[in-house]
Amino acid sequence: MADLPASLLILNGKSADNEQLREAIMLLRDEGIKIHVRVTWEKGDAARFVDEARQLGVATVIAGGGDGTINEVATALIQCEGNVIPALGILPLGTANDFATSVGIPVALDKALKLAIAGNAIEIDIAQVNKETCFINMATGGFGTRITTETPEKLKAALGGVSYIIHGLMRMDTLQPDRCEIRGENFHWQGDALVIGIGNGRQAGGGQQLCPNALINDGLLQLRIFTGDEILPALVSTLKPDEENPNIIDGASAWFDIQAPHDITFNLDGEPLSGQNFHIEILPAALRCRLPPDCPLLR
């Protein structure tokens, strides 16, 4: 593996003391592989490190963290200009790791690191909101957004993705649906939504398959709306097969426009964005990502 080009790992500061990761990096360095490591501590660090990665001429920028870290690195990469832009590698180190899990990134850090450096770089889509903010995995609105943004950090650290479900059950009596109107290509719906999922990827909230048909290189966004007047019946209904569920509405489009009479909040790969009007569009083949050969999200 010594003939592989250099990589730069952008590591979320929360994982800076990960001894297992240090050992994996040292083993690869002993094999002659050049890996630069930079640690983020505040917003904007990832973009600066991507600029540095281009100056160093590395072939891959590896995002080491959860969905938010992957989002920040991917967003910085698609904003790069020029012909030679590094590929994105993924090292899952977050609470839920929804995107990494759904695309088949290995859980073992040494295997994930080798894939991030030596895996095949494949062009994938990314989504953009209101011409500025991006998400690589999913935008969630309604009940799901409030749960993921309000779940205490200590609960997430202790229980991982299960913490979202537990906190959701605790908050069920205070959550109400969002009234909104959604338009897309050959799609129009308006009403009260308990949960809205707009996916480039398939899952969010610690493993919840909100958009089970999503692919990351088909030029489309998948939409799933959970409707209903009460939270508990809607949650119970999600256990039914989709074709039997009257509370599920699906759509697919290269773009969706969402309007609401009041502020609603979308969670974009872990980052909240509030407003009354959202234009969400897919950017086809926006970046290259090193993925396993059997990645289930590729067409």
UniProtKB/Swiss-Prot annotation:
A Gene Ontology BP annotation from the UniProt entry: phospholipid biosynthetic process
Query: Which PROSITE patterns does the record cross-reference, listed alphabetically?
Result: DAGK
Q: Which InterPro entries match?
A: ATP-NAD_kinase_N (IPR017438), Diacylglycerol/lipid_kinase (IPR005218), Diacylglycerol_kinase_cat_dom (IPR001206), Lip_kinase_YegS (IPR022433), Lipid_Phosphate_FormReg (IPR050187), NAD/diacylglycerol_kinase_sf (IPR016064), YegS/DAGK_C (IPR045540)
Q: Give the residues the record marks as binding Mg(2+).
A: 215, 218, 220
Q: Per the entry, which co-factors are needed? A: Mg(2+); Ca(2+)
Class in the EC hierarchy, top level: transferase
Q: Which GO terms describe its molecular function?
A: ATP binding; lipid kinase activity; magnesium ion binding
Binding-site residues for ATP, renumbered to this chain: 40, 66-72, 95
The places in or outside the cell where this protein is found are: Cytoplasm
Record key words, sorted: ATP-binding, Cytoplasm, Kinase, Lipid biosynthesis, Lipid metabolism, Magnesium, Metal-binding, Nucleotide-binding, Phospholipid biosynthesis, Phospholipid metabolism, Transferase
Which catalytic residues are annotated? 271 (proton acceptor)
Q: Which GO terms describe its cellular component?
A: cytoplasm; plasma membrane
Q: How is the cofactor bound?
A: Binds 1 Mg(2+) ion per subunit. Ca(2+) may be able to substitute.
Q: Which Pfam families match?
A: DAGK_cat, YegS_C
Q: Where is the DAGKc domain?
A: 2-133
**Summary of the function given for this chain in its UniProt record:** Probably phosphorylates lipids; the in vivo substrate is unknown.
Please give the family membership noted in the entry: Belongs to the diacylglycerol/lipid kinase family. YegS lipid kinase subfamily.
Q: What is this protein called?
A: Probable lipid kinase YegS
Q: Coding gene?
A: yegS
